[in-house]
């Protein structure tokens, strides 16, 4: 069931719940306006979740961190594709099957058929990642490795943005990267 919570600036926030009573939170916006909607997630939603995974695209959580999702209560943040219905359904399915909580942002993956470089929204992504890090006392924070696994620019940028935000919070001892899950 979809519940519309608020129309916020250039977008909307809504929640899709599943039979496990876990949720996927969506933030629909474009990069031209600041979206302070993360504060609308009820604080008790994160109770019992101390692991955070930040990925660039839906399916990255499965490809690079799937076995970890099966073994822990993760909050999975996906930076792109909140506006793509198929990718949303796939993400919801993974979240449901693993008992995780999902937060899907809607920063662009592609514009006019070309990979977006996030220049127009990098500051907004940085602010959203910082806000998510402040939402809980994360014991484990997982993201793409600095090389972007196979050189994908969004994976590299997600790694850089997450690493910087974690460093700013002096929590590098909690940061792990995909690949070999090398401790940062």
Where are these regions (language model features)?
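Short, well-ordered beta-to-alpha junction loops that form the rim of enzyme active sites
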Residues: 143-147, 153, 180
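Proline-aspartate-enriched helix->loop->beta-strand connector
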Residues: 133, 137-147
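Active-site rim/loop-helix segments in enzyme catalytic domains that contact anionic ligands
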Residues: 12-136, 163-164
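Short, flexible loop segments at boundaries between secondary-structure elements
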Residues: 167-184
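Short Gly/Thr/Asp-enriched flexible loops that form oxyanion-binding sites at enzyme active sites
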Residues: 150-165
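Hydrophobic membrane-insertion alpha-helices, especially the h-region
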Residues: 1-13
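Conserved acidic residues
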Residues: 49, 139, 173
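Short, solvent-exposed loop/turn segments at secondary-structure junctions
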Residues: 81, 109-110, 147-149, 182-183
